Amino acid sequence: MRPALAVGLVFAGCCSNVIFLELLARKHPGCGNIVTFAQFLFIAVEGFLFEADLGRKPPAIPIRYYAIMVTMFFTVSVVNNYALNLNIAMPLHMIFRSGSLIANMILGIIILKKRYSIFKYTSIALVSVGIFICTFMSAKQVTSQSSLSENDGFQAFVWWLLGIGALTFALLMSARMGIFQETLYKRFGKHSKEALFYNHALPLPGFVFLASDIYDHAVLFNKSELYEIPVIGVTLPIMWFYLLMNIITQYVCIRGVFILTTECASLTVTLVVTLRKFVSLIFSILYFQNPFTLWHWLGTLFVFIGTLMYTEVWNNLGTTKSEPQKDSKKN
């Protein structure tokens, strides 16, 4: 029952989270900082109450290690959300972030001196080609959909390039953080709930540097049209409602992934998260009518197949199917 519940939470929470993020970004493209701050604050308060026991429970992993992890996590979160300000469409944002396998492999080879099979290199090549196709086609759309002025078109393209650079940086930084986490968990044991709390609580002072931008968007949110929440009948500006739902769904998504990691094998977790991204992408294209050509679909297919190849889903499904047959023969 718990694995089924976890899968339901991941799909319901993560997919709806993307929807509310796009609703926010479409109305105010520069709202990434206030969204990040709200998410961090909510998870930090929840963790302080239920995980840290109001600060009475000492951390299993020393704070100095969390400080390093938090610096990376804060940077990745802010840069990823800020990329939406730089002419990056939500579908491309999702596809590009699916390239985490590439970043993990590159840094794994460089830092951990890992070696992989030809099968895994092939899968990464597919993911790389898929992301390149989607990125290249999005670049053509940015220049063609810009203003008729040639200067405006060039300026939009430059901002788009900065967005791609930001996403690439965040991708590599996220992979480096994953390697750092892996070494910490090997040394101190797995404490994922504790890590979740400290990763969101310790960066909160850093938002002081973004306070002006957060305040400006809070004022803009206050000026949005009023919306009456069904059932409870409370009325509030619709942008605050979108933000509230984004926070709640983000929490549901994170909790779902956490339950999934404790109940299922890592292969299952990867497969569920990959399928969730694919569903979110399709919904974003169909519901929000984001421009998506045949080339984009081809690139997405390459990314999806490459990810499944990397996790060796087919091989593992074959072994799991053969195991019951062996058991039945023995009986």
UniProtKB/Swiss-Prot annotation:
GO cellular component: endoplasmic reticulum; endoplasmic reticulum membrane; Golgi membrane
A single GO molecular function term of this UniProt record: UDP-xylose transmembrane transporter activity
Transmembrane segments: 4-24, 30-50, 59-79, 92-112, 117-137, 153-173, 201-221, 229-249, 251-267, 268-288, 291-311
Highest taxon listed in the record's lineage: Eukaryota
Membrane topology type: Multi-pass membrane protein
Keyword Lyase set for record: no
DNA-binding among keywords: no
Record-level GO BP terms: regulation of gluconeogenesis; UDP-N-acetylglucosamine transmembrane transport; UDP-xylose transmembrane transport
PANTHER family attached to this UniProt entry: NUCLEOTIDE SUGAR TRANSPORTER SLC35B4, SOLUTE CARRIER FAMILY 35 MEMBER B
Protein name, UniProt field: Nucleotide sugar transporter SLC35B4
